[in-house]
From Swiss-Prot:
Keywords: Flavoprotein, FMN, Oxidoreductase, Pyridoxine biosynthesis. The gene is pdxH. Binds 1 FMN per subunit. GO terms for molecular function: FMN binding; pyridoxamine phosphate oxidase activity. This is Pyridoxine/pyridoxamine 5'-phosphate oxidase. Catalyzes the oxidation of either pyridoxine 5'-phosphate (PNP) or pyridoxamine 5'-phosphate (PMP) into pyridoxal 5'-phosphate (PLP). It comes from Burkholderia lata (strain ATCC 17760 / DSM 23089 / LMG 22485 / NCIMB 9086 / R18194 / 383). Pathway: Cofactor metabolism; pyridoxal 5'-phosphate salvage; pyridoxal 5'-phosphate from pyridoxamine 5'-phosphate: step 1/1; Cofactor metabolism; pyridoxal 5'-phosphate salvage; pyridoxal 5'-phosphate from pyridoxine 5'-phosphate: step 1/1.
Length: 214
């Protein structure tokens, strides 16, 4: 019988060299993300978001990236959820993209800020109607009696707002403003390639690149 200790893959699809990467980590991320799209990976926009609560307890969950530019990485959620409470207490977070089919991961760390109300409104209006209703119906992370309770809340919201629910005040966007971004490429014998971009100053547009030991 196969045991957990016996499960392993020898990575050999590609390499990652300083001479081949973009000087800007956002350009490098864009390059890798486009390659993930071209490879038709299932939901390459999924990422793990790690936060820390007021009690020091870490928490992680999968969320969807909804925007990337030179300012940072944007996602949307309920501000009153566990992640929202964590980020209110400690506005620092880490993101992880894992594209196993390409034997790649990207680790991103930095400070968190809320997006503007206009940016949140614009994205909320683009969501499917069911998702907009769900943002009102779900008290995310709260204990509920049953599935029937959730469905009753959904019906009540639908009857109240019809086809045009506004954005809830407790729902909107966050932007992770990175100070470090690591690109990881799997290599044979666990001697992986790891290139770390670090911002030269808090608001600097320039970055330094270092190679990390695997």
């Amino acid at each position: 019988m196969t045991t957990l200790a016996d499960l392993r893959i020898n990575y050999s699809r590609a390499s990652l060299d300083e001479a081949d990467v973009a000087h800007d980590p956002f350009a490098q991320f864009d390059r890798w993300f486009k390659e993930a799209l071209a490879a038709k990976l299932p939901e390459p926009n999924t990422m793990t978001l790690a936060t820390v609560g007021d009690d020091g307890r870490p928490s992680a969950r999968i969320v969807l990236i909804k925007g990337v530019d030179e300012r940072g990485f944007v996602f949307f959620t309920n501000y009153e959820s566990r992640k929202g409470r964590d980020l209110a207490a400690h506005p620092q977070a880490a993101l992880l993209f894992y594209w196993i089919e390409l034997e790649r991961q990207v680790r991103i760390e930095g400070r968190i800020e809320k997006t503007s109300a206009e940016e949140s409104d614009r994205y909320f209006a683009s969501r499917p109607l069911g998702s907009r209703i769900g943002a009102w119906a779900s008290e995310q992370s709260a204990v509920i009696d049953s599935r029937a309770t959730l469905e009753a809340q959904e019906q009540a919201v639908s009857e109240r707002y019809g086809d045009n629910p506004p954005r809830p005040p407790h729902w909107g966007g966050y932007r992770l403003v990175p100070d470090s971004i690591e690109f990881w490429q799997g290599r044979p014998s666990r001697l992986h390639d790891r290139l770390l971009y670090t911002r030269d100053a808090d608001t600097s547009p320039s970055w330094s690149i270092s190679r990390l030991s695997p």
